[in-house]
From Swiss-Prot:
GO terms for cellular component: cytoplasm. Homodimer. S-adenosyl-L-methionine binds at L72, G103, F122, G123, R124, M125, V126, W127. It catalyses: pseudouridine(1915) in 23S rRNA + S-adenosyl-L-methionine = N(3)-methylpseudouridine(1915) in 23S rRNA + S-adenosyl-L-homocysteine + H(+). The lineage of its organism: Bacteria, Pseudomonadati, Pseudomonadota, Alphaproteobacteria, Rhodobacterales. It comes from the Bacteria. HAMAP family: 23SrRNA_methyltr_H (MF_00658). Specifically methylates the pseudouridine at position 1915 (m3Psi1915) in 23S rRNA. Its EC number is 2.1.1.177. This is Ribosomal RNA large subunit methyltransferase H. InterPro entries: Alpha/beta_knot_MTases (IPR029028), RlmH-like (IPR003742), tRNA_m1G_MTases_N (IPR029026).
């Protein structure tokens, strides 16, 4: 299993980057004994000004053939943390690669959303795409703690 976080834009040094790195390091430590691989963070920039379509091309080229494509989108399905953990466990148990895609400021191209195995939302509000990275990294860590039976996730 390979786990990719594909994101448009480069996260500069600062609190958001620190949080993403911290949560992904926690995920790696917690997930390794569970058979979850470290997250490969891929950042893309459309330097030619092609917008969402060019960004979609860059993301699509990076996604491994046969990988489950999960897109973060305001129109996506709102999952609970345990439901997200169940998805992650299912992909792990089936040996399927997973690519989690976060679009730029304008979102993701419709053709990439249509191709997704799962469109996921962090609620009906729109979030800055750089903050979504932090939220997704935290949810990955939370999912690993749920699968490990750790007390981090409380209901």
């Amino acid at each position: 299993m390979k786990l990719q976080l594909c994101a448009v834009g480069r996260l500069r040094s600062g609190p958001e980057r620190d949080l993403v790195e911290d949560y992904l390091a926690r995920f790696e430590r917690t997930g390794r004994p569970l058979g979850l691989p470290p997250v490969q963070l891929l950042e893309f920039e459309d330097r030619k000004g092609g917008g969402m379509e060019a960004e979609a091309d860059l993301i699509a080229k990076a996604v491994a053939p046969g990988a489950a494509l999960v897109v973060l989108d305001e129109r996506g399905r709102t999952l609970s943390s345990p439901e997200f953990a169940d998805h992650l466990a299912h992909w792990r148990d089936s040996g399927r690669d997973v690519a989690l895609a976060i679009g730029g400021a304008d979102g993701l191209a419709p053709r990439l959303r249509d191709r997704a195995d799962l469109a996921m939302s962090f609620g009906r509000m729109v979030w800055p795409h750089m903050l979504v990275r932090v939220m997704l990294a935290e949810q990955l860590y939370r999912a690993a703690t749920i699968l490990a039976g750790s007390p981090y996730h409380r209901v």
